[in-house]
């Protein structure tokens, strides 16, 4: 738990390579599935061309960008065993007068393959909550660090006023070596 963490700190702590294991519950079908993927999160500076382009796409002044990240994923889900891969750029824009809330610009949504802006808020416990409303789907995710190398995520998807899916992910940082015993 990282008390007092803001969005910039959260992005910085998220940078790196992660192994993600997901369990999803499809409530309408009463089915559960699991999946795994490798995530790569690369920090982008506010003057990175991808950050500037995304701000312009949303008619936002790039000077309002707090930071940026490129998130890439490569994984499989149990039900189809096909590769699911892609990437997106994320740019947080703080609400005026707030260090803890704002808009999160996305190059591409996860539930729909179109650009979408969501809302973010940082809790006093260091957890990041993301709310994204697509044309037909409402998505709410909560991400937090159990330790510097273990990130947890819960998410719900709602369609047409009812819950359709709930997920839990554990994400373990890759490439971390144990310190030598003294």
Curated annotation (Swiss-Prot):
The keyword Lyase applies. Keywords: Lyase. Pfam families: CpeS. GO terms for molecular function: lyase activity. InterPro entries: Calycin (IPR012674), CpcS/CpeS (IPR018536). Coiled coil: none annotated. Gene3D superfamilies: 2.40.128.20. Covalently attaches a chromophore to Cys residue(s) of phycobiliproteins. Belongs to the CpcS/CpeS biliprotein lyase family. This is Chromophore lyase CpcS/CpeS. The gene is cpcS.
């Amino acid at each position: 738990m990282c008390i007092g963490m803001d969005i910039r700190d959260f992005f910085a702590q998220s940078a790196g390579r992660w192994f993600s294991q997901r369990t999803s519950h499809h409530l309408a079908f009463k089915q559960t599935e699991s999946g795994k993927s490798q995530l790569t999160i690369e920090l982008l500076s506010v003057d990175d061309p991808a950050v500037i382009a995304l701000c312009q796409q949303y008619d936002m002044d790039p000077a309002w960008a707090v930071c940026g990240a490129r998130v890439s994923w490569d994984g499989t889900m149990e039900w189809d065993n096909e590769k699911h891969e892609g990437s997106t750029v994320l740019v947080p824009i703080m609400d005026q007068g707030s260090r803890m809330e704002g808009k999160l610009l996305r190059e591409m949504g996860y539930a729909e393959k179109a650009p979408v802006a969501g809302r973010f808020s940082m809790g006093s416990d260091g957890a990041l909550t993301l709310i994204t409303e697509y044309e037909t789907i409402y998505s709410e995710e909560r991400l937090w660090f159990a330790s510097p190398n273990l990130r947890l995520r819960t998410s719900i998807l709602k369609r047409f006023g009812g819950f359709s899916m709930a997920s839990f992910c554990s994400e373990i940082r890759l490439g971390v070596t144990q310190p030598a015993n003294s």
